[in-house]
Amino acid sequence: MKSTLSSILSLIVSSSSKLPYVSHYSYDFQHGWLNIVVSEYKSQKTCGDIRISNNELQYKLFCGKENGKGMIPLSKIKFKYEKDIFSAQSIISGKIFFSVKCTQEQYRYIEKYIKK
């Protein structure tokens, strides 16, 4: 039982550690968007971006297994931060739109804009 649990946990950790990561972010005061740039795992190569306004999420990711794009009203999304992973999930279907590695410091900055 213990070895099975250890195997499952190591699989979860290894797959989550290969996620793309938040490389930098900025707030565009002119247009009211938080712009988050995402880079590939173990690289500085940009592979997507996430934009959050006061009522909408726009994302475009082409980062290995984290692929997708969309525009979704914030009222239909639940943001989550757990174990250095920032994700957005549909409140209706439960579908996870994206998951990216993110430090606590980065998330504290992002959180200011998603909790407005």
What are these regions (language model features)?
Residues 2-6, 106-107:
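Short amphipathic alpha-helical segments that mediate assembly, nucleic-acid/protein binding
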Residues 4-48:
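Anionic N-terminal interaction surfaces
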Residues 23-25, 48, 77, 86-89:
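Residue-level detector of beta-strand structural context in well-folded domains
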Residues 28-29, 40-47, 64-66, 87, ...:
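A composition-biased, non-transmembrane "mature-region" signal
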Residues 32, 55, 82-86:
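Beta-strand-connecting loop/turn residues
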Residues 36, 57-61, 88:
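Short hydrophobic/aromatic-rich beta-strand segments that constitute the beta-sheet cores
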Residues 44-49, 54-79:
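Phosphoinositide-binding peripheral membrane targeting modules
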Residues 83-116:
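Acidic, Ser/Thr- and proline-rich intrinsically disordered linker/docking segments
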